[in-house]
Amino acid sequence: MAFSYGFFNAKNLDRVYTAEDFTSYLSSLICNGILDTYGDNFLVTASGNLSVVIGTGKAWIGGHYFINDMAYTLDLRQYVDESLSRYVTIGISCDVSDSVRACKLEVKSGTAATSPSVPAFENTDTKTYLTLASVRLNGGITSISQSNIKDYRSDEKKCGYVKCILGKCKVSEILAALDSYNKTVTELNNRVAEFQERLAEV
């Protein structure tokens, strides 16, 4: 399975989760965004034709998670106009309305024009978005290049990365800080041991 999500209230047992699902949930953090320590962080890349590839990743939206555990190819040929250009925006949505209760990948199409604008996802009381990227589809295009793709993952107003509980650093940053701290402690312990050896020789 490429995608999974959770957790939502069940109706007639239509939403069932395992212990593994729950532990995966607990291993994530609170702030909305992409977990920067999992997979490819949903990187959107050109595939050489009219498709793009969504890399593996894990997102956190309002206490719900969305996982892509294998590369996912998204065909955009239906959005190509013969003569005019348009943008499409790719994102992850979390819909908590009773009729949906799910997270999924979404594409929002802009209007074809001589000077097209980038369509934006709009959050509502029941639906929240993380915008991954926008893709410019020039009129009559036969393949998408990487230069046609704009990455929004680091834009905290549109997406952003999951941060630690204090909301001041990404997971990878706090892990790097801990690694640096451990190296410093090890170095200090070595110096203390060396000093004690010298004292013993006196």
Q: Locations of the language-model features?
A:
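N-terminal alpha-helical "arm" segments
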Residues: 1-42
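Conserved P-loop NTPase/AAA+ ATPase motor core
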Residues: 43, 49-51
